[in-house]
A protein has these predicted regions:
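Intrinsically disordered, low-complexity "prion-like" regions in eukaryotic RNA/RNP-associated proteins
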Residues: 121-125
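A glycine-rich beta-to-alpha transition motif near the start of alpha/beta enzyme domains, typified by
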Residues: 1-118, 155-201
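Active-site glycine-rich loop that binds ribose-phosphate moieties when present
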Residues: 126-143, 170
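Internal active-site segments that recognize and position negatively charged phosphoryl groups
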Residues: 137-138, 142-165
Length: 201
């Protein structure tokens, strides 16, 4: 069988996009892992299946789309960056209004819009639980929070002068693999406050 796919990137993450209307059933996790493999497959951070939530209008557009995001290991979650990429894709294809619409993900509905001033897609997350303090032993700096946006995130606060030579991979891997976050792991973000209203990540 042959299926169309698209490969899009947004702020450092790349995704394989599939029109779910072409698929009688979603692939298994092992297939997703093969596609996302950067040596043997297409290479990607995740796979996005999409389909209109309602019938297309006369112009071929739909204001609400379903988004099924699968991580590179085949697990399902919500991905904020993936939703931005999908909106930009649907907008470019002429399948969603230029101003925005709604994406329905595994954790609920999220509004997407075009940020005219910055000329970038933006997503308004649905209500999420407030951040909580991460366990001190799961942190490398002792200053960390945990927030679940539909996808779990460990936020590690560091000093701005640490960013230049910060070993994101090894430090992040150490936190991701902590027993506290087993068995699925956690997204790890290193964030520095560089001004009254400025963050670097």
């Amino acid at each position: 069988m042959h299926f169309n796919f698209w490969k899009w990137e947004g702020t450092g993450n790349d995704f394989i996009l599939f029109d779910q209307r072409e698929w009688p059933e979603l692939p298994i996790a092992e297939d997703i892992a093969v596609w996302c493999d950067r040596e043997q497959g297409l290479g990607a951070d995740g796979v996005i299946f999409f389909q209109p939530r309602t019938d297309l209008d006369d112009s071929g557009k739909c204001a609400a789309w379903e988004m099924d995001y699968l991580n590179a290991d085949g697990s399902r979650s919500f991905c904020g960056n993936g939703s931005r990429v999908l909106f930009a894709f649907l907008r470019a294809k002429g399948w969603m209004e230029l101003e925005g619409g709604v994406l329905h993900a595994c954790d609920g509905a999220h509004a997407v819009k075009w940020h005219a001033e910055l000329e970038v897609p933006a997503v308004q997350l649905m209500d999420v639980n407030p951040p909580i303090k991460a366990p001190h032993w799961a942190s490398s700096s002792g200053l960390s929070d945990f927030v679940d946006t539909g996808s779990p995130h460990h936020i590690e606060w560091i000093e701005p002068n640490e960013l230049e030579a910060f070993d994101v991979f090894s430090r992040g891997q150490g936190i991701r693999n902590q027993a506290h976050y087993a068995p699925d792991g956690v997204n790890v973000d290193f964030v520095a406050c560089s001004g009254p209203a400025a963050l670097q990540m």
